[in-house]
From Swiss-Prot:
Superkingdom: Eukaryota
Chain's gene name: RBM39
Originating organism: Homo sapiens
Segments of this protein annotated with the region Disordered: 1-146
Variant or mutagenesis effect after changing M265L: Associated with resistance to anticancer indisulam; decreased interaction with the DCX(DCAF15) complex in presence of indisulam; abolished degradation by the DCX(DCAF15) complex in presence of indisulam
Biological role stated in the UniProt entry: RNA-binding protein that acts as a pre-mRNA splicing factor. Acts by promoting exon inclusion via regulation of exon cassette splicing. Also acts as a transcriptional coactivator for steroid nuclear receptors ESR1/ER-alpha and ESR2/ER-beta, and JUN/AP-1, independently of the pre-mRNA splicing factor activity.
InterPro entries: Nucleotide-bd_a/b_plait_sf (IPR012677), RBD_domain_sf (IPR035979), RBM39_linker (IPR029123), RBM39_SF (IPR006509), RRM_dom (IPR000504), RRM_dom_euk (IPR003954)
Pfam families the record matches: RBM39linker, RRM_1
Protein name: RNA-binding protein 39
Cited Gene3D superfamilies: 3.30.70.330
Tissue: Widely expressed. Highly expressed in pancreas, skeletal muscle, lung and brain. Expressed at intermediate level in kidney, liver and heart.
């Protein structure tokens, strides 16, 4: 058995060697394969590792970029927030609400970290003092003067320059006393000065000194100063208010109308002043034409007064219209008197004794004139006019004579209230224009013209032509006040060289200050061209 085994082993030995070689070769191959596999694995691992590293790096980069972006965003947000906060602070600083005091903003201030001193200052500035709530007492005037006392301290100024201001008047009159108030009178429509003003002084003693400044130049124009006539104006206003009576309907007389004027035409003229209750135009029963007069009744007396002021003398169809008051008698009847006739107003009528008495009574109404007791008794005894058949008329008409008398009286009163005190000296304005005068000796010609004119009223003892004055002023001194008054009345308002002459009195001391040589002048002057 052993031999068999050996023989078999011997027979199988070469095959085993080949198998061993093959196995060794296979082992080497396997090892090499394993090595190759391991190498490839290591390389793949390395590749994988490198790729993972690169991925990690890219991720890190992306993370860093995102973080930087987030940081930038956060920074920009913070900047925006800081800007908005600064804007809020500015807004709060400019416009402080009543709820922005220390009680409401203490937490915010704590975060901002303002100093304690600033907080206190803001608190003090924002907190309202309890003493400021009380209003300051109204200042009372230093001296409570009555209107009459204030009028005694006031002067009236005329012939003022167009560009003058209250400050200029105050500086001008401060040389004679302390000025309390200056009131310039201006036109209510154009707001331009009318050339007049009232100046009130603190002391009464300053008034005569201010009047002595008449003739002094203020802004190149000689001023006229006189005492205020406010007390007379106040008395006239009170009397006018008493005559006005209570409000209510008022009837007006309208006369001197053209015969073709109709009631509709009168309504169109008078209705803009107020509501009209009735219009009665007197017609001639024979001819059917208007008699030239009528009556208009207004619902409101104020409207009637406005119409009376504006339309009296208004030219209608080439004739000045006459408008007057109508007062009713207690025993009035509907019939109108013959005195209502406009034709009778122009031609007049021969009345008897009773008629003259009644006409006197009617003309005396509203004027304050007293009728003698005997005339009043005669009027009470007679019940009608001398014509007998004519019934007692119901309306009293303001006749043209009465209207003219009242107009003249008011004009004289106004002139008396405005006209300054007359003296021997006066000033003539608008006598020449220095810019247009080119002839040699033109001032001598003007002087001779004035002397010739004044010699008709008493003469001249001194005259001066101010060749440099833009107003064309000529100063004249007469031997007496009567001569000066006559010359002023003759020259004032006259036209000379295309301009209207203005004459104004100059106080004697002022004239002597301007022309010292006139103090000793006594000889009457004659024209040099004689």
């Amino acid at each position: 058995m052993a031999d068999d085994i050996d023989i078999e082993a011997m027979l199988e030995a070469p095959y085993k060697k080949d198998e061993n070689k093959l196995s060794s070769a296979n082992g080497h191959e396997e090892r090499s394969k394993k090595r190759k596999k391991s190498k490839s694995r290591s390389r793949s691992h390395e590749r994988k590792r490198s790729k993972s590293k690169e991925r990690k790096r890219s991720r890190d980069r992306e993370r860093k970029k995102s973080k930087s972006r987030e940081r930038k965003r956060s920074r920009s947000k913070e900047r925006r927030r800081s800007r908005s906060r600064s804007r809020d602070r500015r807004f709060r600083g400019r416009y402080r609400s009543p709820y922005s005091g220390p009680k409401f903003n203490s937490a915010i201030r704590g975060k901002i970290g303002l100093p304690h001193s600033i907080k206190l200052s803001r608190r003090r500035s924002r907190s309202k003092s309890p003493f400021r709530k009380d209003k300051s007492p109204v200042r009372e005037p230093i001296d409570n003067l009555t209107p009459e006392e204030r009028d005694a301290r006031t002067v009236f100024c005329m012939q003022l320059a167009a560009r003058i201001r209250p400050r200029d008047l105050e500086e001008f009159f401060s040389t004679v006393g302390k000025v309390r108030d200056v009131r310039m009178i201006s036109d209510r429509n154009s707001r331009r000065s009318k050339g007049i003003a009232y100046v009130e002084f603190v002391d009464v003693s300053s008034v005569p000194l201010a009047i002595g400044l008449t003739g002094q130049r203020v802004l190149g124009v000689p001023i006229i100063v006189q005492a205020s006539q406010a007390e007379k104006n106040r008395a006239a206003a009170m009397a006018n208010n008493l005559q006005k009576g209570s409000a209510g309907p008022m009837r007006l007389y309208v006369g001197s109308l053209h015969f073709n004027i109709t009631e509709d035409m009168l309504r169109g003229i008078f209705e803009p002043f107020g509501r009209i209750e009735s219009i009665q135009l007197m017609m001639d029963s024979e001819t059917g034409r208007s008699k030239g007069y009528g009556f208009i009744t207004f619902s409101d007396s104020e409207c009637a007064k406005k119409a009376l002021e504006q339309l009296n003398g208004f030219e209608l169809a080439g004739r000045p219209m006459k408008v007057g008051h109508v007062t009713e008698r207690t025993d009035a009847s509907s019939a109108s008197s013959f005195l209502d006739s406009d034709e009778l107003e122009r031609t007049g009528i021969d009345l008897g004794t009773t008629g003259r008495l009644q006409l006197m009574a009617r003309l005396a109404e509203g004027t304050g004139l007293q009728i003698p007791p005997a005339a009043q008794q005669a009027l009470q005894m007679s019940g009608s006019l001398a014509f007998g058949a004519v019934a007692e008329f119901s309306f009293v008409i303001d006749l043209q004579t009465r209207l003219s008398q009242q107009t003249e009286a008011s004009a004289l009163a106004a002139a008396a209230s405005v006209q300054p005190l007359a003296t021997q000296c006066f000033q003539l304005s608008n006598m020449f224009n220095p810019q247009t005068e080119e002839e040699v000796g033109w001032d001598t010609e003007i002087k001779d013209d004035v002397i010739e004119e004044c010699n008709k009223h008493g003469g001249v003892i001194h005259i001066y032509v101010d060749k440099n004055s833009a107003q064309g002023n000529v100063y004249v001194k007469c031997p007496s006040i009567a001569a000066a008054i006559a010359a002023v009345n003759a020259l004032h308002g006259r036209w000379f060289a295309g301009k209207m002459i203005t004459a104004a009195y100059v106080p004697l001391p002022t004239y002597h200050n301007l022309f010292p040589d006139s103090m000793t002048a006594t000889q009457l002057l004659v024209p040099s061209r004689r």
